[in-house]
């Protein structure tokens, strides 16, 4: 059941991301990734909101949490996960780990894009 919940949430989240990105490009143009920026900010807000609510005020089942957080928000943006994990490190007092996590995530992520692009360019 959990796999189905994640799949349903991911399908919804990915379609929301696509729709929002198309809308933003039509509204403001495609020269800047407005859609991705909007998705990442909304997703970061949503994961913080949902997970704090789920642990303080609501009683979500594991399946519901997986559908919303792992599926929907994971399909919408993985940036929200990075943001919430950074929040968790900071609020637990692990400032150095949070800084290292953010810098390494962005640094290695960007390096991965360049590496992947480089490998793709040299393929026959």
UniProtKB/Swiss-Prot annotation:
Subcellular localization(s) per the UniProt record: Cell membrane
Activity regulation: Na(+) is not transported, but it plays an essential structural role and its presence is essential for fluoride channel function.
UniProt-annotated binding residues for Na(+): 74, 77
UniProt entry tagged with the keyword rRNA-binding: no
InterPro entries, per the entry: FluC
Pfam families noted in UniProt: CRCB
GO cellular component: plasma membrane
TM annotation in the entry: 3-23, 34-54, 66-86, 100-120
GO MF entry, a single one: fluoride channel activity
Keywords: Cell membrane, Ion channel, Ion transport, Membrane, Metal-binding, Sodium, Transmembrane, Transmembrane helix, Transport
Membrane topology (UniProt): Multi-pass membrane protein
GO terms of biological process kind: cellular detoxification of fluoride
Catalytic activity: fluoride(in) = fluoride(out)
Keyword match Metal-binding: yes
Entry's family note: Belongs to the fluoride channel Fluc/FEX (TC 1.A.43) family.
HAMAP family: FluC
PANTHER family: FLUORIDE EXPORT PROTEIN 1-RELATED
Role summary: Fluoride-specific ion channel. Important for reducing fluoride concentration in the cell, thus reducing its toxicity.
Listed name of the protein: Fluoride-specific ion channel FluC
Species: Roseiflexus sp. (strain RS-1)
Upper taxonomic lineage: Bacteria, Bacillati, Chloroflexota, Chloroflexia, Chloroflexales
């Amino acid at each position: 059941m959990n796999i189905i919940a994640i799949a349903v949430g991911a399908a919804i989240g990915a379609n929301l991301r696509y729709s929002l990105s198309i809308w933003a490009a039509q509204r403001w143009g495609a020269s800047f990734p407005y859609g991705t920026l909007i998705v990442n900010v909304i997703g970061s807000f949503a994961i913080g909101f949902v997970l704090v609510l789920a642990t303080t005020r609501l009683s979500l089942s594991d399946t519901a949490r997986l559908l919303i957080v792992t599926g929907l928000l994971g399909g919408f943006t993985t940036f929200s996960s990075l943001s919430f994990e950074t929040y968790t490190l900071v609020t637990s007092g692990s400032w150095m780990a949070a800084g290292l996590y953010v810098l390494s995530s962005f640094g290695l992520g960007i390096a991965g894009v360049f590496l992947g692009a480089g490998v793709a360019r040299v393929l026959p």
